[in-house]
Amino acid sequence: MEQWIRSLQEKAEGLRLDGKKAELPITAQQAEELYQYMELLLTWNEKMNLTALTDPMDILSKHFLDSAAGGTLLPAGSIADIGTGAGFPGVVLKILNPEHPVVLMDALQKRLSFLQEVCSALELQDVELVHERAEEAGQKKEYRAQYDCAVSRAVAPLPILLEYCIPMVKTGGVFLAYKGPALQEELSASSHALGLLGCTVESVHKITLDGEDWEHIIAVIRKEKPTHPIYPRRQAKIKKDPL
């Protein structure tokens, strides 16, 4: 554990946002919580498909530090991780930014069972687990326009992801879309969806890690006006006819 934690803290020094060092202080307690999270992830991954990455150092860099980079872009207030899967980025953001209330939403109960164990083992406070499909949750008053920030990582192409997530963001709030280096193409295909959903791309940020050959992008999308009540549509319609 000690060697992994040292590696985490050293690699965190090499995390860069737009080429500049990302200010990512990680306390000893937070590092231990991330290690415990990783152990649970690997244990549960033996019986269910949570991650294709099984090397602890790959999990450190490609899951944990990638997820953590969005913490420098968070507004104050509540966070909803839509399609959280194994908890990326939501659990990592919660560990490193404990002051934020966090909702972890997923359509599969077995993933939420894993996340329940993680939250219990790490004694994470102010975390709500929600078993819902995003397109259904976005039409329910308890979730619609309720969050200061939504986040999502590698769930769907951006035009579809916008329809899933923007309805749950408060007017004036933001959506952080974690994407790969092909984001610019997705943004070009999303202009119609952005207009219909009442939002604009506020900024785009490149995430890199010294010594690693991957590059990820986070788009910060601002919700400027309430979403029309017809959105989100049913899943079949969203997939057949993306905005």
Where are these regions (language model features)?
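Short "lid" loop at the C-terminus of a central beta-strand within the Rossmann-like core
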Residues: E135, P157, G180-Q184, L209
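Conserved beta-strand signature within the Rossmann-like core of class I S-adenosyl-L-methionine
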Residues: G172-A182
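SAM/dcSAM-binding transferase cores
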Residues: S188-L243
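Conserved SAM/SAH cofactor-binding pocket of Class I
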Residues: L65-A154, L162
